[in-house]
């Protein structure tokens, strides 16, 4: 693998024509694992909300899963996405993460927005009001 990488790098660098007046060379990313900038925040929220328990249920709030999703959020997500998820679908780490990321990069009407800060994303996940400050402090301590 090392030899292949060196060979590819050699080919790329030899094609750069450093010092040439020709058009600038193009570099390509051959492989990327992607950017997961919200993963630490999502993990902290899941630990805070459910202790990381995928099958957690809060009967008082009727919230389920690792992110403690409630029916009103499922309904809102379904409306914006044109999906028909049920509350029990959100026992899934992946689906809950997908929902979190959607609401982190879209406003309440489903329009794309610039990605939120960790603080704004966590407070919005929690809800609204003064308790979101305490919530953020708890999440921040887990980061």
Where are the regions a protein language model picked out?
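Catalytic glycan-binding domains that act on GlcNAc-containing polysaccharides
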Residues: 22-143
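Signal peptide cleavage region of secreted peptide precursors
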Residues: 16-21
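Sec-dependent N-terminal signal peptides
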Residues: 4-13
């Amino acid at each position: 693998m090392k030899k292949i990488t060196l060979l590819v790098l050699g080919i790329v660098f030899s094609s750069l024509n450093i010092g040439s007046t020709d058009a600038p060379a193009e570099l390509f990313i051959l492989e990327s694992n992607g950017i997961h900038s919200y993963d630490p925040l999502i993990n902290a929220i899941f630990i805070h909300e459910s202790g990381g328990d995928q099958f957690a249920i809060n009967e008082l709030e009727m919230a389920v899963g690792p992110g403690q999703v409630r029916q009103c959020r499922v309904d809102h997500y379904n409306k914006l996405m044109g999906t028909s998820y049920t509350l029990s679908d959100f026992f899934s780490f992946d689906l809950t993460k997908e929902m979190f990321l959607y609401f982190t990069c879209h406003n309440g009407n489903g329009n794309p927005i610039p990605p939120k800060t960790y603080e704004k994303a966590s407070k919005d996940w929690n809800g609204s009001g003064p308790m979101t400050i305490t919530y953020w402090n708890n999440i921040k301590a887990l980061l």
